[in-house]
Amino acid sequence: MYELPASVRLALWATHAIAADRPLSEALGAALPDVDAVEGGLPRLELWRDLGERIVCVDLPRPGVHGGLLPPGGPATQAAIEVGECLFVPSLGGVLVPRLEYYGPAGDEGLKLTLEPHDSDPVPIHRLEALALADIDRRFREALLAHVGVLESLHIAPFLGPSARERVDERLDGARWALPPGLHPRALRIITTAGLVVAALDEALTTSGGLDAGSVAARERTLRSLLDEAELALAQAATAAAIGLAHDAARPR
């Protein structure tokens, strides 16, 4: 079963809880139905809220490919790159990096998520508020078309073999998005579409499809490039959605 990255779910549920004046402990439970134990994170989230933060944002950086939302360099960004995700607050500059591990005896293992706190430079809020859903959507759609076109020009099907498609179907069967109510419809569509693409690409990258070495290398480069675009769209759309939740809550009723 596929789940969105923990940071995406946590950022949106934490922002929703702050906007609705709900306990942040509820946000952790709602965001992480697949996790048996959560360590850390709650005191830092509550501190951020008490110091006036209203928006929790997301970045999904990879080695060599920085998502562009966190300041480049620094221990916090490096820790996020190690695991491929983080949540952060812009004004104070705080970062939480989720690390998953299994615990318990064999046959009765549980899944624990540790939220590792880091300090970081603040992120100008105007940079984040400039994330327009229409632009994110357009860029992602263009990337999908361009990358599929490259694969077709190489006479390579984007996703090869029935076994890979079956594995994708298994991962997506009953996919748990674990997202809060009130998200902008366009943001929700981008988040779920990008999540589906990430799941499909993860599976596609596990098989060569019986291609020759040159085609395998070209295919992998193209798929990894598209994966970068999908994760960028996912992080940006989630951050834009969080900003939307906070702004909606601030409007006079």
Locate each region found by the language model.
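Internal, hydrophobic cores of structured domains that mediate oligomerization or house catalytic pockets
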Residues: 52-150
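N-terminal intrinsically disordered, low-complexity regulatory tails that precede a folded domain
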Residues: 1-91
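Glutamate identity and glutamate-enriched acidic tracts
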Residues: 3, 26, 39, 46, ...
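Intrinsic-disorder-associated interaction segments
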Residues: 1-11, 17, 21, 28-31, ...
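Acidic-enriched, low-complexity/disordered segments with a strong bias for Aspartate over Glutamate
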Residues: 21, 34-36, 50, 59, ...
